[in-house]
Structures are given as C-alpha cells and as structure tokens.
Amino acid sequence: MSKLKLNPYFGEYGGMYVPQILVPALKQLETAFVEAQEDDDFKAEFTDLLKNYAGRPTALTLTRNLSPNPMVKIYLKREDLLHGGAHKTNQVLGQALLAKRMGKKEIIAETGAGQHGVATALACALLGLKCKVYMGAKDVARQSPNVFRMRLMGAEVIPVTSGSATLKDACNEAMRDWSGSYEKAHYLLGTAAGPHPFPTIVREFQRIIGEETKKQMLEREGRLPDAVIACVGGGSNAIGMFADFIDEPSVELIGVEPAGKGIDTPMHGAPLKHGKTGIFFGMKAPLMQNSEGQIEESYSISAGLDFPSVGPQHAHLNATGRARYESATDDEALEAFQQLARCEGIIPALESAHAIAYAVKMARECTKETILVVNLSGRGDKDIFTVSDILNGKEV
C-alpha cells in the first residue's frame, strides 16, 4: 500500500485511528482525492454543480438593523441561500463526485440536524447513487421536516437508538456499516472531523465559502474584514470560512461553540475550551470525557452542534492561538434567532444563531470602526417547531 500523500496531522491533532480493515479504504480515498484535485475535468464539473445546481456564489449581505453599534458593520455570508438550505451542500457534491470517480454505487452518511442528510440525499438523487443515512433517534424526533425531505429524495433513514441516540451514535453506526461495505460504498462524512483524510477533504470542498467572502469583501469594502465568525460543532462551516483567511494575520478567526445550559454545567458541547485530548471517531482531538476517560454526552439546543468532539484543524488553530473560540448558550442563541428574524427578515438555523449571538455581543463592545462577517451557515426552517415549542406560545 502506498504511503500517505497528505499530512494526516494538524500539529498533534488528527491521525487515522481506525480498525485495520478500514485503512486501505481511507488510503484509497486519499489517493482518489489527490488525483481529483489535479484533474481539470473533475474541478470543472464540481464548479459547474456549485454554480448551476447549488446556486453559488452566495450573497454577502450587509445587515441594516442587527448591529447595536453604529461603528460596527455586520455582514452575513448567506450559506442559508444555498440549495438544500445550508453549507453542507458544498462538500457533499464534492464527495459524491469523488465516490462516483472511485466506482462506488452506494453512499453511507450520518446526520445530526438533518442538513447533512438532506444534502447527501439530494446529491445521491442527482448523481444516481444509493443513499443510506444514520440519524440519532432523538434527532429524528426533533428534525422531522428534514427526515421527510431525505425520504422524499429516496434516502433510507435509519434511526439509531444506542447511547445518547444523537450525532455521535449515528457516527459510530455509520462507521460500523462502512467497515463491512467499503468495497462498494463510500462513507460521506458530514463534518471536518474523523479519520484522515476526511478533515482535509471536507475543508477543501468547503473553502469556497471563505474564498468568495474574501473576494466579495474586497469588492464591497476595499479591504478584508476585521473578524470572521462561525459556529463550531464538528467545524466544517467554520473551517470553510477560515481556510482562506488563515494566512491573513489582520483577520481574526472566531469560532463559537455551544454553551448549552451553561459552560459551568454538564449540559454543553464545548470540547475545545472545556474538554481533554482523547481518541474518538478515528482522530485525536479535544473530547468531552469524564475522569475515567469515558465520553460524556454533549448537549446543545441545536442538533447540528450536539457533538462531543471537534475537528483536528480547529484544535490546532486553538492551540497555536491563530483562532479564538468562544461560546454561546441556548438562551443567547434563541434570542439571536428571534433578533435576526425581527431585524433583518432572515430566519437562521439555530446553529448559525450561536455565531450571530456572539457577533452582536462583540459589536456592542467595539470602540472603533469594525467590520465583522458571520457565516450564516444555514436557514432556520428546520428549527421553527423546536423554537415554537420552547417559547411555548409566548409572543415571539
């Protein structure tokens, strides 16, 4: 078997901690990805799908009423306008094309909020691939609109009842399935985490977010933003925004983890700042674990951020200080969800609302002219019933 072509680590984080049976499949995937990145026909087809199917470039919207500070402009990178309703569509189209290139006939995926599942289902429908999606039973219950969308597009949705019945358990089941079917199936991982080469593949297929943002900012403002802000669960929307700005030292990179019921409670999903390094989901990364090293259940109001670990490149950016990671509570995200709807007529995903919440807080504290860009990673249609139940009939 050939040597790895890409560095599997980001500093001390990352790697390929998987059963031996999966190593050939991961090496095959890495080789196919490297070859595809050098193939002009592959890149042209991917670019065409992003433009003429998914609807790129997405808008960069200057908010009119959201900023609490006249010195601060808050822009939104509108991934909510992408076909499928979230940033997930970008990298799913890339991986699905890669799977076809490798001769795979079936796609296995996991999903939390259902957005990755929907994106996978639409890509499989488009490209004629069989689709199987693992989803925690709790998430199936709280994300019923997305479950219906997946099934409507021909996907088989498999509820996972083991463990906490959420995203981490869906990930485990999907990986287990792939262990026995990798010769015919591709595991289409939904975030910039997991074993090498997934964190790199997902970043490269998502980096269009930051590339477009940089170009649009230079056109609109004649300069780069002071900070780009994105929510962080596994971290794909954030790494997509950050990737093209990492080498721009004037631009602050800010990730926002879910503080849930409070960082000082067990009910959160913020392993970057409040976890310990461990091995999970095929990678070495910060992980929520107890004193005995067992994985603790993460918690967030938003299913897509309800994950006990985080992508290895985010761990490295945090360790080196290149990016800063903050957090927002359920209550802060709920307030931001309503605030954006009221102020701008845009209903964000609860995941994205965490980033909005931090941006508004940051804007309030700025003492000079500042430009912030928030990655509005998805739309909030999927969350309206959850939010309605929580507000319990209160006037929104």
Swiss-Prot record:
Q: Give the signal peptide as a residue range, or say none if absent.
A: none
Q: Which UniProt keywords apply?
A: Amino-acid biosynthesis, Aromatic amino acid biosynthesis, Lyase, Pyridoxal phosphate, Tryptophan biosynthesis
KW Transmembrane (keyword) present: no
> What's the Enzyme Commission number for this chain?
4.2.1.20
Instruction: Name the coenzymes or cofactors required.
Output: pyridoxal 5'-phosphate
Top EC class, one word: lyase
Q: Which residues carry this modification: N6-(pyridoxal phosphate)lysine?
A: K88
Listed Pfam families:
PALP
Q: Which reaction does it catalyse?
A: (1S,2R)-1-C-(indol-3-yl)glycerol 3-phosphate + L-serine = D-glyceraldehyde 3-phosphate + L-tryptophan + H2O
Instruction: Tell me if Phosphoprotein is a UniProt keyword of this record.
Output: no
Q: In which pathway does it act?
A: Amino-acid biosynthesis; L-tryptophan biosynthesis; L-tryptophan from chorismate: step 5/5
Entry GO CC: cytoplasm
InterPro entries per record: Trp_synth_b_CS, Trp_synth_beta, Trp_synth_beta/beta-like, TrpB-like_PALP, TrpB-like_PALP_sf
Any one Gene Ontology molecular-function term assigned to this protein's record: tryptophan synthase activity
Q: Which family does it belong to?
A: Belongs to the TrpB family.
Q: What does this protein do?
A: The beta subunit is responsible for the synthesis of L-tryptophan from indole and L-serine.
Quaternary structure and interacting proteins, as annotated = Tetramer of two alpha and two beta chains.
Q: What's this protein's name?
A: Tryptophan synthase beta chain
Name of the gene this protein is made from = trpB
